[in-house]
From Swiss-Prot:
Identification of the protein by name: Alkaline/neutral invertase CINV2
Enzyme class per UniProt: hydrolase
Lineage: Eukaryota, Viridiplantae, Streptophyta, Embryophyta, Tracheophyta
Catalytic activity line of the entry: Hydrolysis of terminal non-reducing beta-D-fructofuranoside residues in beta-D-fructofuranosides
Organism in which the protein naturally occurs: Arabidopsis thaliana (Mouse-ear cress)
Keyword Phosphoprotein appears in the UniProt entry: yes
Amino acid sequence: MEEGHKEPLVLRVEGSHCSLSEMDDFDLTRALEKPRQLKIERKRSFDERSMSELSTGYVRQDSILEMAHSPGSRSMVDTPLSVRNSFEPHPMVAEAWEALRRSMVFFRGQPVGTIAAYDHASEEVLNYDQVFVRDFVPSALAFLMNGEPDIVKNFLLKTLQLQGWEKRVDRFKLGEGVMPASFKVLHDPVRKTDTIIADFGESAIGRVAPVDSGFWWIILLRAYTKSTGDLTLSETPECQRGMRLILSLCLSEGFDTFPTLLCADGCSMVDRRMGVYGYPIEIQALFFMALRCALSMLKPDEEGRDFIERIVKRLHALSFHMRSYFWLDFQQLNDIYRYKTEEYSHTAVNKFNVMPDSIPDWVFDFMPLRGGYFVGNVSPARMDFRWFSLGNCVSILSSLATPDQSMAIMDLLEHRWEELVGEMPLKICYPCIESHEWRIVTGCDPKNTRWSYHNGGSWPVLLWTLTAACIKTGRPQIARRAIDLIESRLHRDCWPEYYDGKQGRYVGKQARKYQTWSIAGYLVAKMMLEDPSHIGMISLEEDKQMKPVIKRSASWTC
């Protein structure tokens, strides 16, 4: 399929309504007020707060001071900032940058992304030579933190153009707002032409559309805006329309009784059958973060105002629902253990009719007295008690988790380090499923065997989300400990995609080498620790209007 646009659009917009840094602290109820002109603050000094605050309790977003860097304020030479700014840079850093630049993809001479893996030793390329939206996020953050925003801008514009394509799976037409899972650039050396082929799920295993792609696109658009201070891109009619199309898919009215998004298996990073159908924590956390990012970037004009109103209402409902019903700590586990069932009334405590006998044995030993996490899934008569790393880390970054809940997640990580981190950060989920349950849940998937791939495998890319969460909660020592583990093996093992085993000791049996997001995740984690102000790109302060939920009383059986 030939790419419809010969050159990237030249986009301009008149004026701006408010700076993004001001919008992040936005009181949701004020979103409905008449817009007023505010001064754009493009730079903020990082020396207003002591760096020692990062190791004392929960850190406020404004303490980290989200700097909006001017594109010209950083050198564009090939020597990365993470090397230049460190007195004794780890030798892995320079080699990681070299590998990351090798993975860059060009369309008509312009960089538009990075391929999933640069593993020439692998016999089967499959789709690892494509640019995946979710995979490019850590690469994009690395380039932004290094003062190289052009590739990120090109990626945002190119995927925005792909969103406008007609999307079909067999004879069924997908929603207009669906973002591609990936795209591939084909170079014709004879005709000297470049062609883009996009995949919206029609070629994916299981033929599932990527629900997370649109959310990552919105989050990355905000990260670009925060990093560069350039508001013009997000305010263009094209980007405004792109956001509205994505939001239309997930804010439409239907038969839902919950504010969470109903999803199929395989619609996110866990892109194979793993029992995450329903309301998976990863999608709900990304949904929440994308809504907040969109709220800070949508114009309150005739078309945007309706979306702003719907976002405000959905955020209030979603935050209450997630904090009330997805949160699990020692007390809540004890309450569920004592639940009555078959309650019929508005006063029911066990609102989802969760059967206490369905609580798996492992969770009683796993749950410490101090600590907690958002469970994997909640739906009628079903609660998935598994820990999912990405969903919990994004919950911290988006402030879906309250400050107390964020600290509890960090406490759990420290208490259960051997189980959740082991010898290689970070378990994608815990625990694995095996035996008869594995056969039923995965359909006997040979790739998702116990402690492998998505079934309890260890994924180095998750290091960047862990590091960001550690910095936001004032626990950078946890991130340093994880980075030390990464630096002891990742380069020696040729940057694999994932590790296998209960402790994450073995390179994954089907893991690709030189996996780009493993490389980029390491670089982003290193740069955030060196300059914690970078966290402003991918972190949001808690909104004061979304009050922490009051603890519910237990359903007593006596």
